[in-house]
């Protein structure tokens, strides 16, 4: 019998990423775990609908036995079974992030006995979670280089707080992992701005695009009007294509916050990324830790290691026999497998 791993949900940033990473790694390695203090660092601790959906999805995909899988629970015991490929559908029942549920179960399906399709309904454009276009245009091309083949499709947008969005991913078992080397970003090839609107006046998007154009030379600028029943909501994205990597930054519009202020916040984030020679942005760095650990080698550079990144690394090192090295030099932090 494999040893039970004990995790403290309050460690590091104390959010839901500890639980999501633990579920992924438990399904992959077959190691059971207990986590206490789930989301202890959040204003509303314990399992929310999004986290509970991730637990239930993981349970179904590997026939796990679970204790504590209920709303508000701050303790969970998860004993995994065997990961099975198949056609899965999960509903969050709120505007909780669909992509974070996918992020939990897809790595396990890289080791399944056949191809899979996973569809999740819930929120698709959330302030604190990667949107589907980030997964599709930034993460998945990098995963493909690593030998991981999955394809995400956004079927319907669902803005906070209404939800109602649908995201689906098709994924195949991985034959072998390749290493990823992302030490240098390279020169910028082009930049693209995009605004999504649902039930919001078009002039809001035009003002947001104007703010982006005031700071960057954009190769493309697009405004997409979505059906009103997918809103109301608004997101602004700016994609930076460089020689070695494409990064995408986004922000979700807020009520009673002007279009100019919303777009200016995004401009500030992109300028911070471009001011550093690092290849990888803060959010992408979090996404690369697990596949890099599974490959057993590789490296990337990031401007500053976030608490989120350090917490994720700590969880990965509890389940896998890998050790990460973080070395600061020349204005970047080089993250690699020792």
UniProtKB/Swiss-Prot annotation:
Under InterPro entries, the record lists:
RNA3'-term_phos_cycl_insert, RNA3'_phos_cyclase_dom, RNA3'_phos_cyclase_dom_sf, RNA3'_term_phos_cyc, RNA3'_term_phos_cyc_type_1, RNA3'_term_phos_cycl-like_CS, RNA3'P_cycl/enolpyr_Trfase_a/b, RPTC_insert
Which enzyme class?
A: ligase
Pfam families to which the protein is assigned, alphabetical: RTC, RTC_insert
Q: Which GO terms describe its biological process?
A: RNA processing
Q: What is its EC number?
A: 6.5.1.4
What PANTHER family does the annotation carry?
A: RNA 3' TERMINAL PHOSPHATE CYCLASE, RNA 3'-TERMINAL PHOSPHATE CYCLASE
Q: Which HAMAP family match?
A: RTC
Which protein, by its recorded name, is this?
Answer: RNA 3'-terminal phosphate cyclase
Organism listed in the record: Escherichia coli O127:H6 (strain E2348/69 / EPEC)
């Amino acid at each position: 019998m494999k040893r039970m791993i004990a995790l403290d949900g309050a460690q590091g940033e104390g959010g839901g990423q500890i639980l999501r990473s633990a579920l992924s790694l438990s399904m992959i390695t077959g190691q059971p775990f207990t986590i206490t203090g789930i989301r202890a660092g959040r204003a509303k601790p314990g399992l929310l609908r999004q986290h509970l959906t991730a637990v239930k999805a993981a349970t179904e995909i590997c026939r796990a036995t679970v204790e504590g899988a209920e709303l508000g629970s701050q303790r969970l015991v998860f004993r995994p079974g065997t990961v099975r490929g198949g056609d899965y559908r999960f509903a969050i029942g709120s505007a909780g992030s669909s992509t974070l549920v996918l992020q939990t179960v897809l790595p396990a399906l890289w080791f399944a006995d056949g191809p899979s399709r996973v569809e999740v309904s819930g929120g698709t454009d959330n302030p604190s979670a990667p949107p589907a276009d980030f997964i599709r245009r930034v993460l998945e091309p990098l995963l493909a280089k690593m030998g991981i083949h999955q394809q995400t499709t956004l079927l319907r947008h669902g803005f906070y707080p209404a939800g109602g969005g649908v995201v689906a991913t098709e994924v195949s078992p991985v034959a072998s992992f390749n290493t990823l080397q992302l030490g240098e970003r390279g020169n910028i090839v082009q930049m693209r701005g995009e605004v999504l609107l649902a039930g919001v006046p078009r002039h809001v998007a035009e003002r947001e695009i104007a703010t982006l154009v005031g700071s960057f030379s954009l190769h493309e600028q697009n405004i997409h009007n979505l059906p009103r029943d997918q809103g109301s909501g608004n997101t602004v994205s700016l994609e930076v294509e460089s020689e070695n990597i494409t990064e995408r930054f986004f922000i979700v519009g807020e009520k009673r916050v002007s279009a100019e202020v919303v777009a200016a916040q995004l401009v500030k984030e992109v300028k911070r990324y471009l001011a550093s020679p690092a290849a990888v942005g803060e959010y992408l760095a979090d996404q690369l830790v697990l596949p890099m650990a599974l490959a057993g080698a590789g490296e990337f550079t990031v401007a500053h290691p976030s608490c989120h990144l350090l917490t994720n690394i700590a969880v990965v090192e509890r389940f896998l026999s890998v050790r990460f090295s973080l070395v600061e030099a020349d204005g970047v932090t080089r993250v690699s497998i020792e």
